[in-house]
């Protein structure tokens, strides 16, 4: 994944660990987008430069358009694609997709049960996958099955407290400065129900922010009282803006993002626009929301 989150990394690492317990030679394709938080779960399985795979598996990736540059040669060579996004494009030779799962980690756990015994080494990254993709088990797509999966992983003796502390209760001072600046410049529309928070490159440069500092900034907007449609737009390059949309029941996030060439889940989705200014990008997102939400007003 071009911007690997905890679910992508945790699923890949957990499956890789399981395959190794079966005597398989399994590695993860190196990924330059790892953060300080996710890298420790990935690095032990990173493939050497001369490794040539016989089989290729992808986890938690909805489309080959999300492959990083070093993965693009495998775009038409994926033997098995495992995902839980409704917008999944079934690009693998074989595909396992379960949109009702809150996290792809739930699917990987089901697969692991059929392959081998669950060990702490397998369980820890899968707990990272499920906990992070559910925002600490608070999102609306979390089910009783999600909690049962987490309990099964916890029963192996993993240090789940450390995971929760790292991902949900720890912020750098730079991260807090970023959030304060985003909130100070936030724009509100639709009777204050829609918030747009922007992260231009100049803001990251101002605070000397790393990718770890900027990880999951989309979680900030939904915390604003009265907001049920939170747009986070981040500048990735000249004229390139990435949107993360987090919504309540009134707004179908994936339908909005599909209008902009993206996708995801009903309550969390994303899209990327190229060749646009910040104002143009924001306008296109607001127009897309208005097309999906009948009562939306700028």
Language-model-detected regions and their locations in the chain:
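Hydrophobic helix-and-loop "lid/oligomerization" segment in the mid-to-C-terminal part
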Residues: 2, 8-37, 49-54, 134-297
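A glycine- and small-aliphatic-rich helix-loop capping segment at beta-alpha/alpha-beta transitions
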Residues: 18, 72-80, 114, 144-145
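Hydrophobic residues at beta-strand termini and immediately following loops
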Residues: 29, 82, 96-97, 197
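Active-site cofactor/cluster-binding pocket
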Residues: 39-94
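Short, hinge-like loop/turn segments at secondary-structure boundaries
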Residues: 44-47, 97-100, 247-249
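Solvent-exposed alpha-helices and their adjacent loops that cap or buttress functional pockets
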Residues: 49-50, 71-74, 88-89, 118-119, ...
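Short, well-ordered alpha-helical microsegments
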Residues: 65-67, 105, 253
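Short alpha-helices
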Residues: 85-150
């Amino acid at each position: 994944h071009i911007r690997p989150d905890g679910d992508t990394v945790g699923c890949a690492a957990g499956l890789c660990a399981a395959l190794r317990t079966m005597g398989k030679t399994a590695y993860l394709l190196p990924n330059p987008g790892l953060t300080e938080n996710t890298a420790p779960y990935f690095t032990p399985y990173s493939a050497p430069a001369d490794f040539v795979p016989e089989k290729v598996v992808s986890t938690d990736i909805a489309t080959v358009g999300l492959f990083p540059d070093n993965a693009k040669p495998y775009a038409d060579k994926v033997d098995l694609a495992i995902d839980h996004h409704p917008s999944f494009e079934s690009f693998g030779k074989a595909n396992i997709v379960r949109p009702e799962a809150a996290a792809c980690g739930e699917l990987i756990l089901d697969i692991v049960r059929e392959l081998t015994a669950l060990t702490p080494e397998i369980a820890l990254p899968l707990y990272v996958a499920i906990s992070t993709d559910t925002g600490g088990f608070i999102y609306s797509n979390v089910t009783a099955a999600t909690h049962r999966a987490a309990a099964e992983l916890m029963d192996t003796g993993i240090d789940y407290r450390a995971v929760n502390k790292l991902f949900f209760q720890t912020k750098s001072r730079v991260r807090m400065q970023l959030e304060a600046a985003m909130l100070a410049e936030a724009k509100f529309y639709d009777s204050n129900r829609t918030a747009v928070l922007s992260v231009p490159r100049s803001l990251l440069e101002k605070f000397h922010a790393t990718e770890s500092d900027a990880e999951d900034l989309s979680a900030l907007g939904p915390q604003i009282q009265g907001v049920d449609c939170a747009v986070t737009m981040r500048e990735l390059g000249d004229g390139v803006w990435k949107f993360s949309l987090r919504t309540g029941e009134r707004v179908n996030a994936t339908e909005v993002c599909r209008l902009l060439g993206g996708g995801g889940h009903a309550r969390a989705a994303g899209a990327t626009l190229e060749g646009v200014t910040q104002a143009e990008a924001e306008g296109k997102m607001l127009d897309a929301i208005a097309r999906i939400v009948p009562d939306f007003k700028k």
